[in-house]
UniProtKB/Swiss-Prot annotation:
One of its GO terms (molecular function) is rRNA binding. Binds to the 23S rRNA. It holds the Pfam family Ribosomal_L9_N. One of its GO terms (cellular component) is ribosome. One of its GO terms (biological process) is translation. This is Large ribosomal subunit protein bL9. It comes from the Bacteria. Belongs to the bacterial ribosomal protein bL9 family. It comes from Geotalea uraniireducens (strain Rf4) (Geobacter uraniireducens).
Length: 147
C-alpha cells in the first residue's frame, strides 16, 4: 500500500514522501496515528498544493531540533548510585533513567532516542548520543558518582 507521510518516520521517509508499506502497518499504525495519508489521486493533488506548507514544517522541525540539540549539548547530568569498592555499580544506568533525569531538568526526550554504546556499569564520566532528528544528533555528558 502506498502512503504519503505527514511526519518524519525513522527508517521509512520524510514529510511528503510517497512510500510503499505493508497494508497492516498503514491501516493499524500510520493512518490512525495521523502519520500518513493513503496515496490516492485526490490526496496526491492536495499534497502538491501543500508542498510549500510541508517544506516550511520540515524547516521548522529541523530548527526546533537544532535548538533542542544546543540545550542538550550544554546539559550535564550528575547521577549518584550505590557502588562497590572497585567503582562497579549495583545495577546499571540505562537510557530510561537518563530520560527521566532530562525530564526533571525540563527536556523531554523519548528514551529510545538516547543511545548508549553499552549500559553504564561503573563510576565516572560518560557520553550518550541523543538522536533528535535524522539530521541532528546531540552529545549528552553523564557523570556517575558514588552515593
Amino acid at each position: 500500500m502506498k502512503v504519503i507521510l505527514k511526519e518524519n518516520i525513522e527508517n521509512l521517509g520524510h514529510i511528503g514522501d510517497i512510500v510503499k508499506v505493508a497494508p497492516g502497518y498503514a491501516r493499524n499504525y500510520l493512518l490512525p496515528k495521523g502519520f500518513a495519508l493513503e496515496a490516492t489521486t485526490k490526496n496526491a493533488k492536495a499534497l502538491d498544493h501543500a508542498k510549500k506548507h510541508l517544506e516550511y514544517k520540515k524547516n521548522k522541525v529541523l530548527e526546533q531540533a537544532r535548538v533542542l540539540a544546543a540545550k542538550i549539548e550544554g546539559l550535564a547530568l550528575n547521577l549518584s548510585h550505590q557502588a562497590g569498592e572497585e567503582g562497579k555499580l549495583f545495577g546499571a544506568v540505562t537510557n530510561m533513567e537518563l530520560a527521566e533525569q532530562m525530564k526533571a531538568q525540563g527536556i523531554e526526550i523519548d528514551r529510545k532516542k538516547i543511545i548508549l554504546a553499552e549500559p553504564i556499569k561503573h563510576l565516572g564520566e560518560f557520553t550518550a548520543t541523543v538522536k533528535i532528528h535524522p539530521e541532528v544528533n546531540a552529545t549528552l555528558k553523564v557523570t556517575v558518582s558514588k552515593a
